Design a protein with these regions (language model features):
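Alpha-helical transmembrane segments and their immediate juxtamembrane interface regions
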Residues: 120-158
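N-terminal juxtamembrane cytosolic/stromal segments of multi-pass membrane proteins
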Residues: 1-19, 154-161
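Short membrane-interface loop/juxtamembrane segments of multi-pass integral membrane proteins
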Residues: 6-10, 75-92, 159-160
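Membrane-water interface of transmembrane alpha-helices
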Residues: 57-77, 136-146
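Alpha-helical transmembrane segments and their helix-start/interface "positive-inside/aromatic belt" motifs
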Residues: 11-26, 47-49
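Select subsegments of transmembrane alpha-helices in polytopic membrane proteins
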Residues: 18-28, 61-64, 89-101
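Alpha-helical transmembrane segments and their membrane-interface junctions
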Residues: 30-39, 98-119
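Alpha-helical transmembrane segments
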Residues: 44-61, 124-131
Length: 161
C-alpha cells in the first residue's frame, strides 16, 4: 500500500464533518432568509447582501480547507506534519466555519431589528474578536498536545529498540 505525502493529504468525510456542515448550512440558510426579509421590509440596505455573500463564501472555503488542511492555499500559521495534526486542524476549521456563519447571522438579525444600537460598544466589537481568538488559542493548545503525545510515542518506540 502506497503512502500519501502529507502535502497531498485529503481527509475523508465523517459523520462528524457532515453534522458540522449541516449546522453551518442551516445557519447560513436562516441568515439569508432573515437578510432578504430585512431588505424586503426596507429595514436594511442592499449592501447587506455583499456582507452575507462574503460570509457564505468564507464558510464554504473553511469547510473546503477542513478536508485539505495541509494544502498551501490554506495558509496555516503552524506546520502540519502528521495525519493526527491534520485531523485536529480540520475540526477547528469546521468550528471556525460555524463561527463565521453565526457572525453572518448576527449581521442579518441586526439588519432586521437593529439591536446594535441597543448594545454597548465594548460588547459589539469585543464579542466576535474574543470568540475567534479563543478558538484560535484552543486549536493551538490542542495541536501542541497532539505534538507532545506524538513525541512521547516516538521516544517510547525508540526506547523499545
Amino acid at each position: 500500500m502506497a503512502t500519501t505525502p502529507i502535502e497531498k493529504l485529503r481527509l475523508r468525510r465523517t459523520q462528524q464533518s457532515t453534522i458540522y456542515e449541516a449546522v453551518s448550512a442551516a445557519i447560513l440558510l436562516v441568515m439569508w432568509i432573515i437578510g432578504i426579509v430585512a431588505i424586503a421590509r426596507h429595514k436594511a440596505e442592499t449592501d447587506i447582501l455583499i456582507a452575507l455573500t462574503t460570509i457564505s463564501i468564507a464558510a464554504v472555503l473553511l469547510h473546503l480547507a477542513s478536508y485539505r488542511p495541509t494544502q498551501r492555499w490554506v495558509r496555516n500559521d503552524f506546520e502540519i506534519k502528521t495525519v493526527r495534526q491534520a485531523v485536529v486542524a480540520s475540526k477547528f476549521y469546521r468550528i471556525f466555519a460555524i463561527e463565521v456563519a453565526m457572525f453572518g447571522l448576527f449581521i442579518a438579525i441586526n439588519g432586521l431589528i437593529h439591536f446594535k444600537n441597543k448594545v454597548p460598544e465594548v460588547i459589539k466589537g469585543g464579542t466576535v474578536v474574543s470568540i475567534v481568538f479563543v478558538t484560535h488559542i484552543a486549536a493551538h493548545r490542542k495541536l501542541k498536545k497532539v505534538r507532545e503525545a506524538e513525541k512521547l510515542e516516538q521516544q517510547q518506540k525508540s526506547a523499545e529498540r
